[in-house]
């Protein structure tokens, strides 16, 4: 695995890990029933794209109509915080070690790569969800869909 996320606890680092995890996770409909990542990633991407303009619109609308500035600022800050919450969740998830059932599945997929004659870098540390995302992305590109049968 190329990028094993460090277990840094800084919130900015979690946001960066979340962005990296969002880019790495394969958005495949077969994974949707088992992992919440598909829904979180779609909602976060939506928030990144539409919440800042919504916040600006809310501020201008409240100010133009002579409304109070306090509630307008609070609404704008809330709208801007939604995509940040998604990135933070994804960053936290990326650095979380895999539970036993997923760890077994992780190694089974690696074994299927070995059986297909595809070399993989050895696992350096305890696999995390980021490691699983990288493995799944590669598996969807290089293996047939039979690796999903074991879920």
UniProtKB/Swiss-Prot annotation:
Membrane protein topology class: Multi-pass membrane protein
Stored InterPro entries: UPF0208 (IPR007334)
Transmembrane segments: 46-65, 69-91
Protein name: UPF0208 membrane protein plu3094
Pfam families (alphabetical): DUF412
Keywords noted in UniProt: Cell inner membrane, Cell membrane, Membrane, Transmembrane, Transmembrane helix
Organism in which the protein naturally occurs: Photorhabdus laumondii subsp. laumondii (strain DSM 15139 / CIP 105565 / TT01) (Photorhabdus luminescens subsp. laumondii)
Family under the similarity heading: Belongs to the UPF0208 family.
Gene Ontology cellular component list: plasma membrane
Record has Lipid metabolism as a keyword: no
Subcellular location: Cell inner membrane
Keyword ATP-binding appears in the UniProt entry: no
């Amino acid at each position: 695995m190329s990028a094993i996320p460090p277990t840094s606890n800084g919130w900015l680092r979690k946001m960066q890990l979340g962005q990296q995890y969002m880019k790495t996770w394969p958005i495949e409909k077969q994974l949707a029933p088992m992992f919440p990542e598909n829904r979180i990633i779609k909602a976060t991407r939506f928030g990144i794209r539409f919440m800042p303009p919504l916040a600006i619109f809310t501020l201008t609308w409240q100010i133009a109509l002579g409304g109070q500035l306090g509630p307008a600022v609070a609404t704008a800050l809330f709208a801007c915080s939604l995509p940040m919450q998604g990135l933070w969740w994804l960053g936290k998830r990326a650095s979380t070690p895999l539970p036993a059932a997923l760890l077994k599945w992780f190694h089974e997929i690696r074994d299927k790569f070995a059986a297909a004659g595809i070399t993989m870098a050895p696992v350096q540390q305890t696999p995390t969800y980021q490691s699983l995302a990288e493995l799944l992305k590669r598996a969807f590109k290089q293996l047939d869909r039979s690796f999903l049968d074991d879920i």
